[in-house]
Amino acid sequence: MHKHINKESQMPPTAHRPLPTRYVELHARSAFSFLSGAATPEELIAACAELNMPAMALLDNDGVYGAARFHLAARKVGIKAHIGAELTVRSQTSDIRRQKTEGRKQKAENQVAQTFVLPLLIRNRTGYQNLCRLITLMKMRVPKHAKPGECAVTLDELAAYADGLICLTGAEDGPLALDINHRGPREETKVTERLIEIFGRENVYAELQRHFNRAEEARNHAVIEIARQLKLSLLATNGIGYATRAQRQVADVFTCIRNHVRLETAGRLLSINSERFVKSPKEMAGLFADLPEAIANTVELSSRLEFTLKDLGYEFPKYPVPPDETMTSFLRQRTYEGAHLRYGRNGEFTRAQKQIEHELKLIEKLKLEGYFLIVWDIVEFCKRQGILVQGRGSAANSAVCYSLGITAVDPVGMELLFERFLSEERGEWPDIDLDLPSGDQRERAIQYVYQRYGPRGAAMTANVITYRGRSAAREVGKVLGFDDETLGRLSGLVHTWEWKDPKDTTERQFKDAGLDL
């Protein structure tokens, strides 16, 4: 039985050993861990920059939704943005028994499923591809409004897509913690040993966090012992849930909203303290003064994580062309077929041909033939089906788009500037917008794309829905236990937020709404 551990006893004396001065936070959640993380990616990077930390890893729940914003914010201040995710994993076994019911034999299968959260870090481009495959697998086989735990990958799927990924054993909801808490000592390393088998011993790190929690520290002792038995490297993280200590209050509100409870009744659903903020290397070294290797390993592991989003690049999809054609030749043929129809064979065609050749050479150089052919294919389908379709925006500046029938404005005759649409110097991809009717006709076009290119070869852009001021005020008011009348006044106040004279203040506005501050 573990002894009582207080705040002081968790931090061994440090006078006899030097403290590491370098540390990289490799386990942080953002607000893209919906209603779990309380800080935006930009706020996490700002806290990291203020502490002169050279890198940070973002691991959101079951997705990489915040990765782009995290990467862009990090690039602006010279911080390396490591990417990963916390994946929900289901380890499942079957217990088959037979029982007799009304004289007939009935086979009943009891499935015992253990679900845990597995932090994964991306080591290289292959790892990014594999993590995305795992996320896609889990998302596509569950209902749209799946309950927590329904969306999960299996250990066998992890084994199929483990290349390029680094595995951490996680915190209180990780595989090793669940083994320690719920299984006997003979089985307590079963899942961890399977993870070693899947990822390789050098790619599995025993994660340790210290938030002045007795149960957590007792678990840490067991993790350290198991790590030494299995020859795993120790890794210190702070399990970041918010950028600053003050944001803990936001995290508590999110916890209440997620669990549909008021703050006064949330109880043990809330974190016991506000320690999950971005801490300095000095603070983290002090927390792990007895385990300097756990701090040093953060720097070592960070150096192994070669991948950032700037290495991803983009490969445009390939259009299926006849066996005797290339995408370049097929696009050229379709373009000139349309150009002869649009411009005829007079002097106007000669003038247009010069512009078309200029555009085709740039399209070929940038390897964009597939993109133009796919858009052309969608437009052709719509025309065959009698669906109104029209390209718009800067695509109207392209003679190739005009010749392919994507747009309706002659850019040569109108002397429009092609480089406004596509320019090698600008380094931006072209954007061809297609206007379609709403309703069934639009849906028919979408379904054609899925059928033509396959369910894994096409996707719709997802929108992240965020709280506006009025809805946010109502949700926070519910958490604080306000009655309906007060909620109405509060949301109305935020909805029309303005200061009409210099004497107006936030405090006065709330008092005018009848709120006792």
Spans of model-derived segments:
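Alpha-helical scaffold/interaction cores of sigma-54-like transcription cofactors
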Residues: 2-93, 100, 110-517
